């Protein structure tokens, strides 16, 4: 168990991370640097796992950052130990498969929503699907996640009352 401060990086671009992380308390965001701008592509909350996809699946350096947005309580497991558990324990292997399926579906839904919904509809879905997160996360990160500017998000918020 690790108690880690806000702004601590669990993974960084170019670093081969050797752990997967479980968030007991706190939240994180995963982001990329694109043309010098931070683009948030994921939030992880209590009960979620987070990790560098490249490190977990290919044992290569990561292409994204995972930053804690709050003081957090994190458990870590070395990736080789996790892989051994998958190989030797069918219940854990199935649990891991289900987690990965859920994440894949969330990612696919997000991509489809970015392509097919208006900015207002994306924001409304985000609020209803992530109650309370708006009070925990910087609005700029949410705007980036939803594929809009912070100014556009602020204008939408002024027009919408939940």
PLM features per residue range, with description:
Residues 9, 29, 50-52, 61-64, ...:
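Histidine-centered metal-chelating micro-motifs
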Residues 27-32, 48-49, 73-74:
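Short beta-strand segments in beta-sandwich/barrel cores
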Residues 38, 57-80, 91:
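Ligand-binding loop in jelly-roll beta-barrel domains
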Residues 117-162:
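Phosphate-/nucleic-acid-contacting segments
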């Amino acid at each position: 168990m690790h108690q880690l401060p806000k702004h601590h990086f669990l993974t960084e671009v170019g670093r081969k991370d050797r752990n997967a992380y479980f968030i007991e308390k706190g939240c994180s965001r995963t982001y990329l640097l694109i043309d010098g701008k931070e683009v948030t592509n994921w939030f992880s909350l209590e009960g979620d796992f987070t990790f560098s996809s490249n490190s977990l699946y290919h044992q290569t350096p990561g292409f994204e950052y995972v930053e804690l947005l709050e003081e957090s309580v994190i458990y870590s497991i070395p990736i080789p130990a996790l892989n051994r558990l998958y190989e030797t324990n069918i219940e854990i292997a199935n649990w891991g498969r289900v987690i990965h399926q859920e994440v894949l579906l969330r990612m696919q839904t997000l991509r489809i929503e970015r392509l097919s919904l208006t900015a207002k509809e994306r924001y409304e879905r985000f609020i209803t699907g992530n109650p309370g997160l708006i009070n925990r996360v910087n609005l700029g990160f949410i705007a980036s996640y939803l594929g809009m500017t912070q100014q556009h998000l602020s204008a939408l918020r002024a027009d919408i009352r939940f």
